[in-house]
């Protein structure tokens, strides 16, 4: 039985990769990588996101200047059709991932009830 659970997990992984929503994220990501300005903006977003996550994990809040930078970056992203499409595709995929997470972790939640 223990090996069977890994087979199911691998099957789920393949099913996620086959989702049209996953394929759309890949497609848009490739388009971003092929466009220097979109790629640079995406890299800037990732760096900002990592910085903010690090700050939040250490209990810090972004300064007013950093909040302004975040807002400006968000506006640039909204103005870029490829990045906008990427985040929309990510959002559609995240619906599936949230549902899968809820289903997979239900037995663990039962253990703490």
Curated annotation (Swiss-Prot):
InterPro entries, per the entry: Com_YlbF, YheA/YmcA-like_dom_sf
Residues that span the membrane, as ranges: none
SUPFAM superfamilies in the record: YheA/YmcA-like
Pfam families reported for this sequence: Com_YlbF (PF06133)
Gene3D superfamilies with a match to the protein in the record: YheA/YmcA-like
Domain of life: Bacteria
UniProt xrefs under HAMAP family: UPF0342
Family label: Belongs to the UPF0342 family.
Protein name, as recorded: UPF0342 protein Spy49_0636
Organism per entry: Streptococcus pyogenes serotype M49 (strain NZ131)
């Amino acid at each position: 039985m223990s090996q069977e659970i890994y087979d199911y997990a691998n099957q789920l992984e393949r099913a996620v990769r086959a989702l049209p929503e996953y394929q759309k994220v890949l497609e848009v990501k490739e388009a971003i990588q092929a466009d220097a300005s979109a790629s640079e903006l995406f890299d800037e977003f990732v760096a900002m996101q990592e910085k903010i996550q690090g700050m939040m994990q250490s209990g810090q809040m972004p300064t007013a200047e950093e909040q302004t930078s975040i807002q400006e970056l968000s506006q640039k992203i909204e103005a870029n059709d490829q990045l906008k499409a990427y985040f929309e595709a990510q959002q559609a995929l995240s619906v599936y991932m949230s549902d899968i997470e809820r289903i997979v972790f239900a037995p663990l939640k039962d253990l703490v009830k």
